[in-house]
């Protein structure tokens, strides 16, 4: 005789706690987190060039997951905290961190070419890197230039 639990024996999971925790974590997400993709990719490429395929491939897959998660979190940040996201973009301290998304995209593209031979994914990431580079360079540096209140050089 099998014992089957009744539905009232289980508490319903409160998804609002999970959603609020995600929102709180995304709110102040640093744009410089793509530096993790850069660094992981560089180590993965070095391992590949040194003939360590297990390390190289493991870091390559870790990098793909990290890259996708970071883009997902940044899209959520744009949706939920639009003004804070764009305020960070023109902030003298946090703005330059956005450039790590360019380098991270291009390093991951290099991994796709060297480790998996996937030129299509690499080309997509290269084009994305160019678009991000043009967009971020002109947005961030224009904002820095025309901003009335600029920090001093020692800040």
PLM region descriptions:
Residues 59-65, 124-131, 155:
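Physicochemical signature of membrane-embedded alpha-helices that form the seven-helix bundle of GPCRs
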Residues 110-144:
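A generic, well-ordered mixed alpha/beta core segment in the N-terminal half of proteins
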Residues 3-45, 80-110, 126-129, 145-155:
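Juxtamembrane helix-loop boundaries in multi-pass membrane proteins
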Residues 41, 51-52:
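Beta-strand-rich domains and repeat architectures in extracellular enzymes and scaffolds
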């Amino acid at each position: 005789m099998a014992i089957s639990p009744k539905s009232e024996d289980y508490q319903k999971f409160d998804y609002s706690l999970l959603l609020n925790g995600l929102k709180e974590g995304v709110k102040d997400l640093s744009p410089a987190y793509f530096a993790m993709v850069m660094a992981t990719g560089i180590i993965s490429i070095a391992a590949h060039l040194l003939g360590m395929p297990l390390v190289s491939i493991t870091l390559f897959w870790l990098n793909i997951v990290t890259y996708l998660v970071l883009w997902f979190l940044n899209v959520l940040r744009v949706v939920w905290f639009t003004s804070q996201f764009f305020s960070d973009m023109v902030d003298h301290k946090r703005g330059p961190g956005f450039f790590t998304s360019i380098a991270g995209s291009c390093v991951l593209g290099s991994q796709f070419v060297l480790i998996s031979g996937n030129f299509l994914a690499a080309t997509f990431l290269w084009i994305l890197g160019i678009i991000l580079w043009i967009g971020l360079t002109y947005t961030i540096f224009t904002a820095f230039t025309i901003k009335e209140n600029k920090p001093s050089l020692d800040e």
